[in-house]
Every structure is written in C-alpha cells, then in structure tokens.
Amino acid sequence: MKATGTFFFVVGPSGAGKDSLIDGARAALDGDYVFARRVITRPDGSAGEEHEGVTEAEFARRQRSGEFLVTWDAHDLRYGLPKSLMCELERGRNVVANGSRGVIAELAARLPRFVVVLVTAPHDVLARRIAARGRESGDQVASRVARAGAPVPPHVPCITVSNHSTLEAGTARFVEALRTGTRTSAAERPASRTNLMAKLRGEPLDEAAYVAVLQDAIAGRYTEAELTEFLVAATRTLTDEEVVALARARTAFTPRIDWDEPVVVDKHSMGGVPGSRITLIVVPIVAAYGLAMPKTSSRAITSAAGTADAMETIARVDLAHEDVRRCVAQARACIAWNGRLNHSVVDDVMNAITRPLRLDSRRWSVASILSKKYTAGATHVIVDLPYGPQTKLATRADAEALGALFEHVGKGLGLHVRALVTDGSGPIGRGIGPALEVRDVRLVLDNAPDAPADLRDKALRFAGEIIAFDPRVDSPEHGMQIAAALLHEGKARAAFDRIAAAQGVRCDPVAPGTHTLVVPATTRGRVAGVDGLQISGVARAAGAPRDGGAGVDMLCAIGAKVAPGQPLYRIHSDSAEALEAAAALVRAGGECCQAVRIDPD
C-alpha cells in the first residue's frame, strides 16, 4: 500500500531544543500525528528522551532481522527507528522522529512524503543552553556552536524552525511547521519558482517577486539546496533597488508596532570592536532629552560581550512586548534582548543557510536590519559602521559604501537613516567583558575623572546625531552640545537608573571577577596597537560572556611607553580554572602572537 502520511525528520544543532519542541508538539497535536520512540543502546530510564533501551547484542539482532527503518551511530551509542512506523504512514498518520542528518538521503529515497524540520537558534542562544548544562568549558562550547552541520541533501523539502525565545513560542512555531509540512509535502512545485530561477540567472526581482519567494521558502516548499543557490546568486547580483524591494518585502511578514509618536529612534552597529559599549550611554542621554528609544540588542556570538549581556549584569533584559511599552512609558527607553522581540521567520530560514556557508551577506543584511527597525516602529535610525582589520568592514571605503546603501534603503522604507563611519582598529574603553564594560559606562555617566575618554567621545557623537533628529535641533553639533550638558548635569545617569528600574534591577549586580592575573610587557617599547580578536579571545577563555564578571581590563594606552614587567592588561574570571585557561591561551600566543603589539622605540 502506498504511504499517505508525511514523515517529519527533526534535526538541528546541540542546544536547539529539539526534544523539548517534540514534547510540546506531542501534547498539542491530535491522533493524526505519531511520535517515534527511538531504540538506543543505553538503559531505560537514562537521562534525556523517553526511549527503548537495548543491549548492543539485541540491537544487532534486530538490525539483522530487518526490524529497523533506519539506524545510525552517534556519541558511542547506536540509534534506530522501528520499521513499524511504515504501518502508521500507510494508515495516513504523520510520523515525527528525531534523528541524524547523516541518514536524511537514505530516508528521503525510501519515503514518498518526507520533510526535514531543521530546528535552529542563534549562536548566542545555543551557547548559553549548552553552557548551562555545565559539562563543557567556554572554548568547548564555542567550538561546538561553531560546528556546521551537514547540509540537507538537494531536493529534500526542509522547513526551518527557530527556537530562540520561550518554549511556548518555539513549540507554536514547531507545531505550525508540522501542519504546514503536511499540506505542502506532496504539493506541486511552488508558483514562485519562476522568480527564483530568474534570480539564479542574475535578473533583478521586484518587491512582489521577493514576497512570493519568501512565502514559499517559509512554508518549506523549497529545498535547502534551492535556497542556497538563490542566496548565493543574491549575494552576487543584489542591486541597490533590489535591496529596497527585499526590505519592503520582508516587512510584509511582521506587523509594524505603532508608538503614536512623531519620532521614535533606534541604533544599530555592525560590531567587531571590543568594548565600545556606547549604547548604554547613548540610550539614557536620548531618554533624558525626551525622545522615545525602545532599543533591542543582541547577545554576543563570537565576542566577549553583547549589549544585552552587559545590560543583564544590572537589570532584566528578556522583556516581552508589553514590558517594552511599559518601560518606554515610564523611562522613555529600554535596553532589551532582541531574542524575544525581533523574531523574523525569514531570518529563521535564511540564517540557517548563510551562516554555515559564510556568505558575504552584508547587502542582504541591510534589508534584514532595516526591515526589523521598521516593523519595530522606529522612524529614525543611526548606524555605526566600524572599519578595521578585524571588523566586518575592512576599509573606510567599504564602510562608506555600505553606509550609503543603509541610507538609500532607509529612504525606500520611509525611514530617516544616518550612517556613521567609525574607527574599528582597536578596543574602545578599558573593559572587555560584560561587568567590566558596565563599569566603564558608569564612570562615563558619573563624569568620573578616570572615565575612558574614547568611550565618552564616541557616545556623545552618536547621542548628538540622534538628538539632531528632532526638528528643533538645527545640527548634530548642536545635538552634541545638548548631549554633553545632559551628561554633565547628571540627567543621563538619572535616566539610566530609571531605565534599569523599569526593566527590573538585579538584586545582585554582577561585579568584575575576583580571580585576576596581570599580563606584563616582556619588551621595552611603545604600545602600537591592540589585536581586538586576540584580546576578545582571552576574555572569552576567562569565561566571558557566559560569566558576566569575566573579561579583560586594559591597563595601557595606545602610544604609551612601556618597560619589561609593566602591566598591559588584567584578566578577570569567576573561577581559578577559567583564569588558568585564559592564562594558558596567553602563554600559547608567544612573542609573535600577542594581544598587545609593542614596537621598539
């Protein structure tokens, strides 16, 4: 009898939460869905999923007698799905099974209605979940997260589900994917295929064409191979007007928030600069001035801290939409994690492809960034474009070109966008790591004599540009004067405290780690530069951003003369073990590979 049910094969990286979503779907779906119970060579009752535990000998016997639909090996265990699942398919029931990417091709060749469900989450979310298990070091967690899974074979239908926020939200998306997959697994080729093929030939697409392609991609009507070809073509031939069309198309998938205010401001940075925690200074200055600034920010992926990681050392950041509205009403601003707020179903699908392939998706990202700013209700956006050897933008020319594109696309969306090119050649501020960066922020807000001047100056520049969005302010220079006065008079610090209180102040603010090690100069000379990638690597080895108190405190300035034994930077950690891991990384660097470069006088 021909199988009529759909077989859903669930795959995804460690930390994505596949088992939790499957459990949630089991409770939500009716009897038309059967959830496979895997046979595993480990005892019944072991930690993890409910399974049938068997011995190695019993597993081998069943395999010889043909009792398995498919088998695979992983983590020194053997896994099998029983052949009896075929009977469920023949009865018209849909089967949901958790499995390995390595057997997708084998199953797809045997099952006429077969859909892969790829569960994903941003790298920072995966890292936090894996780290919470307490079984791996910071470097091991980073290595596991960076590991790219095998691609889904060509022509196999694949639906991507992002499980990045709450279990309830992830389960709802997972259940909808199963329902969508049931409807589309045997459907005809998508109507938007002519648009996709046109892009593969290098032809431009308009807004309607992008909407059609994205709708079919979200519904799982394209294979991963087809979407990969599409994205590769788009990174090569995406014109400026197409970026506008793509940005406008993306806004069709998320309703826009209405703040009922003439000016709602936001900020975005392309990142890549250690420290540089200006958002925690800019937002309270702007709030003190009176403009609404509901700022959502990311956690760190490969750096030592993200804005959300830093803010979380003093206040709650996992805000829901109603929390953001309340904070803006009470304090005129918030600094929240974007994981619960700026979800994009389009990014769920596309990021799962672009990240492992390391595609140059900067132009695509402009559409993504600005479409999310638009749907979040912003009217005016400022963009920080740092350039330097270890940032996403290698040269000033690269940054200027991308800045022009940001402003052009913003205009196409009806947004006022101002892009600023900044120096990203080295760290800004002294602290690198969540609590250390917040210490620098507090020094600036408190007008302390030892506040990092570079951090203060950059924050005032951006705050001035934002304040100048107000039609009553005639220039960015005037805006910067207003910003400096708000900072000097303590109004920015008061606004910062109001924002933290509205979000929920931590009763135990995270302090810099008490396990410390000073790294001294080994030669005489002048500090010529700081390698941002290496210094962030040391901070991560010490535990940042997972441990909020971990990081690096810079004790020398560019251009300063140093002698052997003079402190260059201090490593902070929350444990002796993590401190030793960071120290070992420093020792392994040797003279030719140091975070602080010293040139002879």
Swiss-Prot record:
Pathway: Metabolic intermediate biosynthesis; 5-phospho-alpha-D-ribose 1-diphosphate biosynthesis; 5-phospho-alpha-D-ribose 1-diphosphate from D-ribose 5-phosphate (route II): step 3/3
Any one Gene Ontology BP term: organic phosphonate metabolic process
Pfam families attached to this UniProt entry: Glycos_transf_3, PYNP_C
SUPFAM superfamilies found in the cross-reference section: Nucleoside phosphorylase/phosphoribosyltransferase catalytic domain (SSF52418), P-loop containing nucleoside triphosphate hydrolases (SSF52540), Pyrimidine nucleoside phosphorylase C-terminal domain (SSF54680)
Alphabetized Gene3D superfamilies for the sequence: 1.20.970.50, Nucleoside phosphorylase/phosphoribosyltransferase catalytic domain, P-loop containing nucleotide triphosphate hydrolases, Pyrimidine nucleoside phosphorylase-like, C-terminal domain
Enzyme Commission numbers on file: 2.7.4.23, 2.4.2.4
InterPro entries, alphabetized: Glycosyl_Trfase_fam3, Nuc_phospho_transferase, P-loop_NTPase, PhnN, PYNP-like_C_sf, PYNP_C, Pyrmidine_PPase_CS, Thym_Pase_Put
Residue numbers spanned by region Ribose 1,5-bisphosphokinase: 1-177
Catalysed reaction, written as an equation: alpha-D-ribose 1,5-bisphosphate + ATP = 5-phospho-alpha-D-ribose 1-diphosphate + ADP; thymidine + phosphate = 2-deoxy-alpha-D-ribose 1-phosphate + thymine
Top-tier EC class: transferase
Annotated stretches, region: Thymidinephosphorylase: 178-601
Protein family per UniProt: In the N-terminal section; belongs to the ribose 1,5-bisphosphokinase family. In the C-terminal section; belongs to the thymidine/pyrimidine-nucleoside phosphorylase family. Type 2 subfamily.
Annotated PANTHER family: THYMIDINE PHOSPHORYLASE
Protein name: Bifunctional ribose 1,5-bisphosphokinase-thymidine phosphorylase
Origin organism lineage: Bacteria, Pseudomonadati, Pseudomonadota, Betaproteobacteria, Burkholderiales
